[in-house]
């Protein structure tokens, strides 16, 4: 069961860029709650608190119960904007989530057992194609990460999402089988193989 974190906010009477700038000058972060066929609710959050939560990690895969002046909203963050210079939050979007609903989230991929991949042990390099994957999950059971097992992979092999064991009730949110990583040959081996291929082509042309 995913832990639901509590967050306090106050309602904003006005939306728009001017009102948002005023909130930031007052040391707060403007935000909005939307979805579930209800009217959007414009809110503001404590700057220090939301900054700490964002930088603690897993922000976009965490369920929150936001108390807006005594009214509670069950939500998941959908997006946030950071100041391009200061890297401090400027705005946050929250999506309402009903009990039992499923959500699509980006979940980090952790690559394990590199020491058990012959291709890496022989000098190959792990080329990570996807650091995260889009998954359809029950809102109450969002995984912190998924594990990609590199055991047995040789140079030239690829690891796909279909080889990853997903938790119960969790599935890929995209069509097709995402490539997560490949084992690529070291540069010296690539050059040697290219030379061999060129020599073979030249010999075939003379034959």
UniProtKB/Swiss-Prot annotation:
Alphabetized GO MF terms: 5S rRNA binding; structural constituent of ribosome
Protein role: This is one of the proteins that binds to the 5S RNA in the ribosome where it forms part of the central protuberance.
Superkingdom in the source lineage: Bacteria
Gene name per UniProt: rplY
Keywords, comma-separated and alphabetical: Ribonucleoprotein, Ribosomal protein, RNA-binding, rRNA-binding
Subunit structure: Part of the 50S ribosomal subunit; part of the 5S rRNA/L5/L18/L25 subcomplex. Contacts the 5S rRNA. Binds to the 5S rRNA independently of L5 and L18.
SUPFAM superfamilies: Ribosomal protein L25-like
Family the UniProt entry places it in: Belongs to the bacterial ribosomal protein bL25 family. CTC subfamily.
Name under which the protein is recorded: Large ribosomal subunit protein bL25
GO terms classed as biological process: translation
Family annotation (Pfam families): Ribosomal_L25p (PF01386), Ribosomal_TL5_C (PF14693)
A GO term from the CC aspect: cytosolic large ribosomal subunit
Organism: Azorhizobium caulinodans (strain ATCC 43989 / DSM 5975 / JCM 20966 / LMG 6465 / NBRC 14845 / NCIMB 13405 / ORS 571)
């Amino acid at each position: 069961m995913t832990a639901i974190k509590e967050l306090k906010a106050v309602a904003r009477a006005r939306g728009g860029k001017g009102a948002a700038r005023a909130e930031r000058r007052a040391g707060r972060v403007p935000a909005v709650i939307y979805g579930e066929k209800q009217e959007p609710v414009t809110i503001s959050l404590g700057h220090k608190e939301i900054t700490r939560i964002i930088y603690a990690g897993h922000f976009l895969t965490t369920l929150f119960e936001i108390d807006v002046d005594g009214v509670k909203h069950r939500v998941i963050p959908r997006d946030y904007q950071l100041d391009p210079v200061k890297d401090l939050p400027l705005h946050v979007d929250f999506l309402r989530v009903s009990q039992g609903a499923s959500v699509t989230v980006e979940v980090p991929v952790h690559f394990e057992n590199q020491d058990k991949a012959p291709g890496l042990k022989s000098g190959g390099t792990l080329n990570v194609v996807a650091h995260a994957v889009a998954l359809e999950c029950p809102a109450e059971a969002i995984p912190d990460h998924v594990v990609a097992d590199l055991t047995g992979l040789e140079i030239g092999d690829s690891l796909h999402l279909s080889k990853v064991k997903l938790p119960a009730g969790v599935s890929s949110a995209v069509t097709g089988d995402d490539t997560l990583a490949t084992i690529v040959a070291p540069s010296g081996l690539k050059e040697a193989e290219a030379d061999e291929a060129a020599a073979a082509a030249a010999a075939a042309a003379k034959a």
